[in-house]
Amino acid sequence: MDVMRIRGGTPLKGVVKTQGAKNAALPVMASCLLLKGRTLTLENVPDLHDVSTMLDLLACLGVTMERLGNRMTFSVPEEISWEAPEHLVRKMRASSLALGPLLARCGKTVLPLPGGCSIGSRPIDLHLKGLMQMGAKIEIRNGIVYAQADQLRGRRIYLDFPSVGATENLMMAAALAKGETIIENTAREPEIENLASVLRGMGVTVDTEGTGCVRIKGVEEVQGCRERVIPDRIEASTYVLAGVITGGEVTVDDIVPAHMDALLAKLEEAGVRFHVGSSSVTVFPVRRLMPVSIRAMPYPGFPTDLQPQMVATLTLANGVSLVEESVFQARFLYSEELNRMGANITIKGDTAIIQGVERLQGASVRAMDLRAGAALILAALAAEGETRIDEMVHVWRGYEASDKKLKALGADVALEEAEEK
Ligand code: EPZ
């Protein structure tokens, strides 16, 4: 179903349960490629298009999988393919997370460079640089990466940018490298810790320290293990903002509150009242937000994956808010769609200037990427009248059953097929 229709204006009320984190599930699924003739079992795997794409990739490489509810078992044979199929890598950038484990486990891999997307170019130069420092020979011909390494060797690696994917690829490569690898200036997103737990379960010594430095002692062979995917802090935050933007009372369950500190701090600044439980947060009705200034940056800063949703929420604030995007070059394309709904957003360089308005009006809009689509849904929930959101395929990549979850909170939501073009 590629179109979502929302009739806005209803304050949302009720409880919504958070899915397993997309951005934790994808790397830990890729880590199964390190196994030889063993099994990885993951609990709390979300049912998302991106997860299905990763499953297709793993199946192409020779992994057999079994899903029982949100428990997934990955059985990896002694021999697997080391060539990642082009159509899957082009479809999802996270396929590049096969690079590190395949190279470490097979000694070679062939993987197309991932394409860019609507939020900017998405190179993997930091991934490749780290692998070459560990002894890999890497060539790029016609957009395909040819990597070869008889034995990766542990060493100190400094990341020019705390890239999430580069951190994850190098951690997985280091698991089978000879000796110790120390990665400096790593990403510190909670998803990194989830991957570290899986590698520890596989018998690898991983010391993350939580300070942006990861120490890994490589092993000859990794063991099978079982791990749980952490809750999706971005999905959870999106539903918190659905409560805020509609002036409702929403409880988001199954979260790790500490993973949402940056959002909660900004909501407190904006005058939102909320209660934080051990694994839930409840937001209470607020008439109108106060404007705030935000800089989207690597964790523990305000998450770039929540920047579009926060901008949508601030379109109705009582004053001028500023939101700077410091991670991606072009993550404001959705603002034009919000302005078509009556928002007043001006983009100056890497900053959105949001002049709060009294109300938004429903319109026909288009989701350009996953989080842009989420931002449009939030705006539609608050807007007067009906909004039609096209290209929902982007939203299904990262939000499990969002129509059902929103309906359960009282939203007037309907899905339909796009007309034949
Ligand atoms: C992960 O992408 C997430 N995806 C993204 O979530 C998230 O926005 C991003 O981290 C930042 O938090 C998954 O985990 C599957 P990066 P990733 O490497 O690993 C540049 C979503 O909405 N860079 O931290 O690709 C890059 O161009 C998605 O769920 C290089 O220049 O992000 C970008 O500007 C969107 N060279 C910045 O760093 C590299 O080798 C952050 O990239 C790698 C990255």
Question: PLM features: residue spans?
Answer:
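Short, structured segments at the rim of ligand-binding sites
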Residues: 1-421
